């Protein structure tokens, strides 16, 4: 019942070997190996991101099974890189990711490099620039609300969606059904993404999907199907 899965590699040391040598466990020591193993078992659209700095990084992730590749810091700091990527792989394969920190009422700044580097950019201007450079979608994340489950930053999401023509995915703060309903009803966002609600709430995917449909939100209906255990 998930429409799409976004995997963002936010590890800093790039060490993936967990030193587990069980008989029935294949140890995976690189992010590409993890991606390949995951995509082999996944039957939904898959977006992979994190650590993307070169055209080869994009190609590697697409070859690993990604339908789309999310790019954050490299896209913000090097618009020409995104242009080259769009020319080679097509805009439909590229998601530009924006991490925005709220500085005051209706005032945000784009940060990169794990939220450490201030860019001086407004997320609206950044989104427009990324769209012009060739991004097929924009993923906008609220740093302030990330992991808080206190609701989406609707002013931020609304401002970004109004500034571009490409689809916008909102991220950061989704913790209850009402948070999703409010954001869908009060913004023009194309999709909403979340993590904690799905990781720590029993049957969250099915229940959220069902509740949104019941409340009239236009999304694909939930369905129960046979599931294979991997």
Q: How would you name each of these model-derived features?
A:
Residues 5-7, 46-50, 69-71, 94-98, ...:
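Hydrophobic faces of well-ordered beta-strands that scaffold small-molecule active sites
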Residues 4-30, 73, 139-150:
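Glycine-rich, proline-tolerant flexible connector loops at the mouths of alpha/beta enzymes
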């Amino acid at each position: 019942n998930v429409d799409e899965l976004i995997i963002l590699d936010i590890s800093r040391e790039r060490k993936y070997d967990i030193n587990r040598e069980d008989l029935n466990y294949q140890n995976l020591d690189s992010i590409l190996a993890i991606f390949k193993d995951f995509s082999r078992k996944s039957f939904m659209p898959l977006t992979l991101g994190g650590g993307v700095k070169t055209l080869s990084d994009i190609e590697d992730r697409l070859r690993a099974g990604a339908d789309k590749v999310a790019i954050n810091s490299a896209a913000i700091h090097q618009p020409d890189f995104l242009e080259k990527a769009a020319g080679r792989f097509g805009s439909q394969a590229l998601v530009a990711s924006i991490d925005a920190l709220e500085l005051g009422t209706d005032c945000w700044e784009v940060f990169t490099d794990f939220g450490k580097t201030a860019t001086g950019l407004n997320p609206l201007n950044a989104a427009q620039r990324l769209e012009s450079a060739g991004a097929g979608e924009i993923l906008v994340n609220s740093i302030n609300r990330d992991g808080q489950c206190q609701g989406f930053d609707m002013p931020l999401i609304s401002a970004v969606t109004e500034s571009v023509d490409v689809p916008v995915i909102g991220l950061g703060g989704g913790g209850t059904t009402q948070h999703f309903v409010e954001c869908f009803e009060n913004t023009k966002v194309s999709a909403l993404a979340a993590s904690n609600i799905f990781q720590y709430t029993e049957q969250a995917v099915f229940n959220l999907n069902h509740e949104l449909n019941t409340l009239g939100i236009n999304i694909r209906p939930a369905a129960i199907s046979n599931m294979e255990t991997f």
